[in-house]
Amino acid sequence: MNNKLTALIFLGLLAIASCKWLNEKSIQNKIDEKIGKNFLGGMAKAVVHKLAKNEFMCVANVDMTKSCDTHCQKASGEKGYCHGTKCKCGVPLSY
């Protein structure tokens, strides 16, 4: 039960972070409070960091908000493709 609650809190914090209501530092402080400074806490903080620096909301090769494609259309007129959590203009996935 405690693991499920921790996962639920973590997912809630990620959802709030993606809406730009909180910054990365405050979410990592909440992780330290709820999970602690252990292996699981470090993993959670690494995921938050990776998602926080994700400018175009690319998650697992999926453009969740179509902001990658919009950015590439404005910047170079090419289609935007998500490569993991990175946005690349005019470079489709090769796999």
From Swiss-Prot:
Signal peptide: 1-19
Tissue expression pattern: Expressed by the venom gland.
Chain ranges of the BetaSPN-type CS-alpha/beta domain: 55-95
Single GO cellular component term: extracellular region
Coiled coil residues, start to end: none
Subcellular location: Secreted
UniProt record, GO biological process: defense response to bacterium; defense response to fungus; killing of cells of another organism
Annotated disulfide bonds: 58-82, 68-87, 72-89
Pfam families membership: Scorpion_toxin_alpha-beta (PF14866)
One GO MF term attached to the UniProt entry: toxin activity
Keywords recorded for this protein, A-Z: Antibiotic, Antimicrobial, Disulfide bond, Fungicide, Secreted, Signal, Toxin
UniProt similarity note: Belongs to the long chain scorpion toxin family. Class 3 subfamily.
Entry function: Has antimicrobial activity against yeasts and bacteria.
UniProt protein name: Opiscorpine-3
Organism expressing this protein natively: Opistophthalmus carinatus (African yellow leg scorpion)
